Amino acid sequence: MRLLWGLAWAFSFFASSLQKPRLLLFSPSVVNLGTPLSVGVQLLDAPAGQEVKGSVYLRNPTSGPCSPKKDFKLSSGNDFVLLRLEVPLKDVRSCGLFGLRRAPHIQLVAHSPWLKNTASKATETQGVNLLFSSRRGHIFVQTDQPIYNPGQRVRYRVFALDQKMRPSTDTLTVTVENSHGLRVRKKEVFAPTSIFQDDFIIPDISEPGTWKISARFSDGLESNRSTHFEVKKYVLPNFEVKLTPWKPYILTVPSYREEIQLDVQARYVYGKPVQGVAYTRFALMDEQGKKSFLRGLETQTKLVEGQTHISISRDQFQAALGKVNTEIGDLEGLRLYAAVAVIESPGGEMEEAELTSWPFVSSAFSLDLSHTKQHLVPGAPFLLQALVREMSGSEASDVPVKVSATLLSGSDSKVLDFQQNTNGIGQVSFSIHVPPTITELRLLVSAGSLYPAVAKLTVQAPPSRGPGFLSIEPLDLRSPRVGDTFVLSLRTVGIPMPTFSHYYYMIISRGQIMAMSREPRRALTSISVLVDHHLAPSFYFVAYFYHQGLPVANSLLINVQPGDCEGKLELKVDGAKEYRNGDSMKLQLQTDSEALVALGAVDTALYAVGGRSHKPLDMSKVFEVMNSYNLGCGPGGGDDALQVFQTAGLAFSDGDRLTQTKENLSCPKEKKSRQKRNVNFQKAISEKLGQYSSPDTKRCCQDGMTKLPMARTCEQRAARVPQPACREPFLSCCKFAEDLRRNQTRSQAGLARAQDMLQEEDLIDEDDILVRSFFPENWLWRVEPVDRSKLLTVWLPDSLTTWEIHGVSLSKSKGLCVAKPTRVRVFREFHLHLRLPISVRRFEQLELRPVLYNYLSEDVTVSVHVSPVEGLCLAGGGLLAQQVSVPAGSARPVAFSVVPTAAASIPLKVVARGSFTIGDAVSKILQIEKEGAIHREEIVYNLDPLNNLGRSLEIPGSSDPNVIPDGDFSSFVRVTASEPLETLGSEGALSPGGVASLLRLPRGCAEQTMIYLAPTLTASHYLDRTEQWSKLPPETKDHAVDLIQKGHMRIQQFRKKDGSFGAWLHRDSSTWLTAFVLKILSLAQEQIGDSPEKLQETAGWLLGQQLDDGSFHDPCPVIHRGMQGGLVGTDETVALTAFVVIALHHGLAVFQDENSQQLKKRVEASITKANSFLGQKASAGLLGAHASAITAYALTLTKASEDLQNVAHNSLMAMAEETGENLYWGSAIGSQDNVVSSTPAPRNPSEPVPQAPALWIETTAYGLLHLLLREGKGEMADKVATWLTHQGSFQGGFRSTQDTVVTLDALSAYWIASHTTEEKALNVTLSSMGRNGYKSHLLQLNNHQVKGLEEELKFSLGSTINVKVGGNSKGTLKILRTYNVLDMKNTTCQDLRIEVTVTGYVEYTREANEDYEYDYDMPAADDPSVHSQPVTPLQLFEGRRSRRRREAPKAADEQESRVQYTVCIWRNGNLGLSGMAIADITLLSGFQALRADLEKLTSLSDRYVSHFETDGPHVLLYFDSVPTTRECVGFGALQEVAVGLVQPASAVLYDYYSPDHKCSVFYAAPTKSKLLSTLCSADVCQCAEGKCPRQRRSLERGVEDKDGYRMKFACYYPRVEYGFQVKVLREDSRAAFRLFETKITQVLHFTKDAKASIGQTRNFLVRASCRLRLEPSKEYLIMGMDGVTSDLKGDPQYLLDSNTWIEEMPSERLCRSTRQRAACGQLNDFLQEYSSQGCQV
């Protein structure tokens, strides 16, 4: 029996006053906006026949009514009523509730004349105070998957429902917060279907962490609901590893002797077991997650049917603990950490798993006494309720529970003992009789017999006594389900002669009184409650009565078992069916009403990489949201009636008594004290870390102990640590770790041997588990209308995995329902798996190793082949198959050699066929690149038909001697008549690729990130002002807003807590960058919806960087030249100060609220002070062009004094350079260090426009902005805009980010000022003579065209293009030439240098550092017994950080190729750079850089690289500066797919802000490396050499030329275009070619090469993959086809291929021999006849 009671307060009233009539007023303690408020009104003790009329309403005491009135009429026969009081938004606004600053309270008022006339009240009103909340309705947010990679797209849905769980169409506000808690996205939306869907992309630079999507009703700030998702770097696993302990706990009792046992299971995502080896290790983990590894417990076991068992005896465990000086009894509160790495045998893939929740406990059970009341009723039974759970969380049945109850009365005490076993669901109840005199009850409860769990509870009697108590006793202690009838019994306790006739009761659920009723009093009164959906997930039952004028009450919280939704949604597939990838699947959707069903399918492999922590939306989450409206606190009951009402979430008034006003929506939290343990179990390395107390110095120590991927002494590393406080611990710990590693031996006898080694926790990020994925992670993201039933046919993706399909329905009649997910396994009993490299080059040799998996019960023999495709050389031409036998339940790799011969994206298809239906085929795209390195060249011409000299142009073709000889290269020509719409429209800044399409630059740092925002804002502003959005596609406006929001989201990743910004995530803040962000985000306020307070904080930070003289300084500059003028000293300070002034001026727009006016005045004062500084410097006349331009613009923009503006203007104009119709600022006057040689504008219209450096463009753009503000659109502004317009690149941008941002801003302002609706035409004719004859194009354009506003044409690279121009509109013609070159002889390499070397896995000398001799990448066999040198924990787990995968065990000559990259950079001391430089390294084919190595270069205290990016085969390394001395960094790379005859690759080092300053080089694979050897089989090699020349050796064999085969070759087939007799002078290597320089000894024939004569030199090229070698000093007869390239002197050079005749000329001595005399004669006859007569056909 469960006794629930209520106690009335005792008041000293006369008996007559106790029975006076009353009006009782009940209501939920919180009023929710827009939700009807339930109000209970009761008439008590009124005389028979008396009728009471009145009304109830809500009001704000300071203003007036907040709701309409609701009337009531009561009498003794009808003495209670439950009303619904509307709370409209308009009334709440009008009564001023939203303006209340403190907790907004509202009064519920009952008004009736009866109160004053009959109830003797002073007024006609009676009321109670309620808390007002803008929370209303229910919102649910769903994402398409629980975890994402940086750079991935997040798709989400928001479901909006009202208080009754019915669809709501009210406006929603949706926000996204990043892992730093910063809002990065906000939008207001209207969802007519009540389901809003959207998506966004996580910035690729995002740090790991938890993001949040929140949604609320726009008018309800407190209706906020959110969902979280994880962002971390991962790739989907091929198989999942699970760790399952035999017992979910480890007992710390010393006498406990059982073994610690653990099962390891590895299964592919499609359910089949994995073959392989499991490597396991253990650690102790504390409450903060810090791990200390236990040496000696490491194991290496073989998987059998995907499983293995690990057992650790108690003695083994205690021995391991002894090494860290601790005892097993000290471990309670800690956890045993287990980590396992499984390497599968067939493919060598490695997956990992960890177990972090294996606690050390003193008992196998836990005790929960939360359902026991905290109030004692003397004289009544006390019900103790306990729930016993096992440590796994499941209920523990049939467990003995003992209770020792001590009853205290003053100094007397009595002890009662009880014992009982738990029932089937772990529950047990004890009824303890409490005598009337007892004041305190102390309970000691224990569960379990051998090692029991213990809990204590003390309850006390109420401080005062009343007339009696009310007991509520449920008939069944179990929680009811929806549809059940819940029966309760009511009875009085301590009232000998009750005088009341009825019990009154209420049912409260989801913050509303759902029912109010009464029941006649009997000796035992039973009440039945039908539990429907409105009472789920919980409700309070509150009962009360009045006795002697005092209320007696009690309450009980009833939890409803979570079950089904109100409606119905079922997802059905044929679960028994075995689906294959690509199959169609029937998905049945069933509802019980018309509904919208939102679907989604998730790859269950996501849960294996950490997605379990963020579970998908299910009914338990729905119930949780619904239950959040529950206003009650605790299981029910209270010390008195008022407390009973209050804890049930009710407000109550009876005229004399009043419940306390609720201050907030939460319940008071019980304070819990947690006992922390500090056990000294650290190994040597932990002791070293323990020497440092602060987190910063510990981080420095850990960084020092981390091994770099390159050789550096500890002293060299410490010298790079910028902070002195960090340098000492870094150096000390580095030397400590170096000594530990030096003492390691390479021949451990077993994996479990103890090692004095570096603790792995500082080497390993356990979440950094990178594996591969080729397939979508989710699909089926769609919303389907369903009317009770719908059958969908969907096609399954190619993944072999298990899909989990989710469904959420939304119905107008039944609300929201979440279906139970259904799983679909996609599997092939026989399938193959194929890996390809990112890209390869032509004629490199590739080894494919598809892996065949056979899960059938019998062996399978299949034939495997690669399908023939043009551009690939294959075994047998692709028709030759390998017969392979794959045993049952196993896997086997098959090797194929392939040589690509065409540069293209080729579909490579591998087919395996067996008998009957057995077989599989996989097709993937192989990206094949041309040899050499890409070279780009751009040319711009101004088209002006009104200028006679510009009506006809002749554009010469390219004749670069370095172009590869057989590349099919072209010149692309683009013509436009509308510069504004081309640059800022849907083909430029607002193109699908966004501003990224304007520039060919990376976007890694914060300043580069702003390129997403600034030009897009400029474009939007231009189109708004000129009203030209209608000329662009309709979706362009939305796309522009999306681009701006993406840029805003990305830049927030760099924000610091104080509002400032740094160039990198872990870099100190920069004044210049912070000002740049403030300017742009201030302009973007309308689109991004950012809070002004954040930008005000940013402006405040900038004020702190101002010096006394008014200038600004930058503690951590981003760039030193590109934006700050390329200047030193004063100029640099002036440019920075002007830049900050411009930003602060734009930032004034965010100071609109009253609270910010004081800071706004400080900003205005700062601008005035800075302007004085700028005016001083401008007056001195010593500034360079850039500083002058930005100063003039800043002073004009901020409306400084006229004198200052005039001085700056005159100074600037004195530096202007004018040529014809062009005006620009180039060389910087005033500082000799800053003079740049002048680049003139074109002398006449027929010449190309010279391309100026980035600094000139930016300076001129500031000049244009200044002129437009000062003079408007005038002649000078026209000339400046003309020059700037023709500096644009082929893509539409300029040189780098800053010049592009400022120039687009300036040109946009100019184009707005000069916008006209007048239409002008431009007619352009382009003609050229190419290989295929004469080609001509006529273009008719106008200045308002959008669709086809430009034409892009293609011409042969070497062809001359003739241009004729007509019409009356100006235009621009741009040419882009892109081709691959043999060599990169760049003159800038004299000033800027880069060198890349690749070696095999380096064994550094002892002098450098013994640490780096150790090879951490020993392979693992699939059977532990085969290891003579087993893999150690340090080898396995530290080595894992340096690789993405492990290959299967192979023979020694088949081990995967690992190489070490060393990148060295330096510069000439006289070369000035902006500071930031980027090294762009194209990796050798088939290689991938080790990400862990790159992260070490950027993330440790001795940072070597600011940032890195990987893009396909490219690795980009960002350097803050280029040193004047040679500095090198290194990283490892793995060749995941074998490639032979690897060709050289390119590397470029360039100044980011002036990309023309660069150095480009080739580098090659290690010499004598297998990377340079052939992999192909005989017929594949023969195919690959089919295009190679063949040297004729007929003369040596004495074969006579009876058939005239030389003449046939020369004149018939293939009919050559040249014939020379040459002497070879030398051989040289050029990229993927060999070059032979020769001297002509006889000219036999020529076609194009008219200058050919004896004694001239000619170059012959042959592919390096061909076997042909021409020996220096020997003579050869060479005949073939004319080349398309020329050498440096302009002479033709020739490619030697299969259409070339190459024959070594015999020596005179050889021809004198009798055997060769006839053959020599025939050769001489041919030479004479061919040279004199040529071909007679």
From Swiss-Prot:
Signal peptide: 1-19
SUBUNIT field: In absence of complement activation, circulates in blood as a disulfide-linked trimer of an alpha, beta and gamma chain.
Disulfide bonding pattern of the chain: C66-C95, C633-C667, C700-C726, C701-C733, C714-C734, C1464-C1528, C1576-C1581, C1588-C1666, C1611-C1735, C1711-C1720
Residue(s) at site: Cleavage: R753, A754
Molecular function via GO: complement component C1q complex binding; endopeptidase inhibitor activity
Keywords: Cleavage on pair of basic residues, Complement pathway, Disulfide bond, Glycoprotein, Immunity, Inflammatory response, Innate immunity, Phosphoprotein, Secreted, Signal, Sulfation, Thioester bond
Presence of keyword Manganese: no
Pfam families: A2M, A2M_BRD, A2M_recep, ANATO, C4_MG1, CO4A-B_CUB_C, MG2, MG3
Isoglutamyl cysteine thioester (Cys-Gln) cross-link, chain position(s): C1005-Q1008
Name of the protein this chain belongs to: Complement C4
GO biological process, one term: complement activation, classical pathway
Mod. after translation: Prior to secretion, the single-chain precursor is enzymatically cleaved by plasminogen (PLG) to yield non-identical chains alpha, beta and gamma. During activation of the complement systems, the alpha chain is cleaved into C4a and C4b by different proteases depending on the complement pathway: C4b stays linked to the beta and gamma chains, while C4a is released in the plasma. The alpha chain is cleaved by C1S to generate C4a and C4b following activation by the classical complement system. N- and O-glycosylated. O-glycosylated with a core 1 or possibly core 8 glycan.
SUPFAM superfamilies linked: Alpha-macroglobulin receptor domain, Anaphylotoxins (complement system), Terpenoid cyclases/Protein prenyltransferases, TIMP-like
Residues of the Anaphylatoxin-like domain: 700-734
